[in-house]
Amino acid sequence: DNEFSIIISNSLNEIDYKNHKVYAKDLKQVDKLIKKETEKIFLSRLEYNYNLFQEKIPFPSLTIRKMSTRWGVCNRKLKRVTLNSLLIRYPLEALDYVIIHELSHFVHFDHSKAFWTEVSKYSPRYKEIRKLLKD
């Protein structure tokens, strides 16, 4: 069960969570917790998906931010992947697809047939996931 309750109380000094409940002084603390947990999850999935690639691609740095028109960006020159923080609202498979998509740009620089073949090696359901992310 992934649901939890948030309890705001001015008497609390630090955030605490147990038994599917988050106890916090204010919503700012809750936002910080969500950001911290998002960073952990995204980095963990980046490491996992990076290891799927047999090619010698560089391990990129990770930036997470809210983007209005993209789910991810690959900057090959800076060896950086930027992920949209809103991906945390989607199933893990969607996050993995976006990471695989961006890592595939280290192998193929465009959206050629070879690029999509690369993506499909690691994310066979990518077409369905793309549909989910467009809705």
What do the PLM-derived regions correspond to, one by one?
Residues D1-Y97, F106-D135:
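Active-site-proximal or metal-binding-adjacent scaffold patches in catalytic folds
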